[in-house]
């Protein structure tokens, strides 16, 4: 079935809200007051100010989701569900994400389900 949702998580790891991403192929993560230019809008989240307007992009290719940092100020990190380690995502080097991973957009946590 694969990845179907991104979850906004609080500091304790509880779900605050969710975005359905099943069936999509490309999603822009960022912040936008007008809610027009980004797919995953972090404008009104606790650490939304740490997200760039165009912070990262999720792309679906060959049955897998990948995240790429778009040259953001505060970076993109992934906490891998398998080994629990934190990985920095480099600009122009897409990184595969899997169910159970946690994506950090600055300090904003997005769970992968």
Segments from the language model and where they lie:
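Intrinsically disordered, low-complexity acidic Ser/Thr-rich regulatory segments
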Residues: 1-49, 70, 95-99, 107-113
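DNA-recognition element of transcription regulators
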Residues: 52
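Forkhead-associated
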Residues: 39, 55-57, 62-102
């Amino acid at each position: 079935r694969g990845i179907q949702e991104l979850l906004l998580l609080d500091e304790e790891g509880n779900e605050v809200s969710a975005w359905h991403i099943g069936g999509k192929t490309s999603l822009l993560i960022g912040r936008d007051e007008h809610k027009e230019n980004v797919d995953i809008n972090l404008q009104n989240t606790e650490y939304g100010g740490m997200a760039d307007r165009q912070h990262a992009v999720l792309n679906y290719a060959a049955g897998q989701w990948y995240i790429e940092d778009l040259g953001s100020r505060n970076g993109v990190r992934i906490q891998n569900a398998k080994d629990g380690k934190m990985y920095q995502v480099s600009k122009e080097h897409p990184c595969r994400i899997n169910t159970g991973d946690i994506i950090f957009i600055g300090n904003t946590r997005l769970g992968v389900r």
